[in-house]
Amino acid sequence: MQHASQLQIPATLAEAVRPDTCALIVYDMQVGILRQLPHGGDVLARVLKVVEAARTAGVRIVFMRHMSLPKKLAGVFQTRQMMLWQSKTSPDEVQPWFLRDSPGFALAPELAVREDEAILDKITMSAFEGTPLAIALRDCGLNSFVICGIATEIGIEPTVRHGADLGFIPVLVEDACGAGDQESGARALANMRHMGDAMICSVDELAAAWR
């Protein structure tokens, strides 16, 4: 641990992921998202290892879900986004994929969320925008978060950058994150490495730090 102006500055992975100062954010591991990725099962298996390690270490866990609004409330941005992602040329052709309580909206059942773990819903890419996540972490005295899930280039990178801007130390579990587009995912990882906001580790390295 480094020290500056009476502050403790984590210098190693183990220092950054201390169970009393960090949380685990499991990003959008939903049925309807996992089935869009050819390697979704592999990502889920590695995320489950991260979740189990966090539970064993007593780390606080927050699961994020992406939620669609009904078409009448979707607004300009969400409607345009649906048209792009669904390759439609008219707003009349799109369908909200992740309406609350729809089959695709649900988290993967293997995650088996526990009573002392939170589920937060969002309509944005950053897990911090429009959710109580930052308030909850700060109120628990946490200054870092570990993140894994899907998709690296769509929501995880924005969450890492937003979290860093809010003063948290992001820790990205590289092999427990999946990309919708492999080239874009690799580019997002390269960008995060270049910026240096996040510590980047593997599932095995994280599990060792939590032992």
Predicted regions and their residues:
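Short Asp/Glu-rich motifs
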Residues: 36, 66, 73-74, 156, ...
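Von Willebrand factor
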Residues: 54-73
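Active-site loop/turn elements of alpha/beta-hydrolase fold enzymes
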Residues: 29, 66, 175
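Short acidic, Gly/Ser-rich segments with clustered Asp/Glu that frequently serve as metal-coordination loops
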Residues: 30-35
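…and closely analogous acidic/polar surface helices at protein-protein or active-site interfaces
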Residues: 37-54
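Active-site-adjacent betaalpha module
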Residues: 1-23, 49-57, 78, 82-211
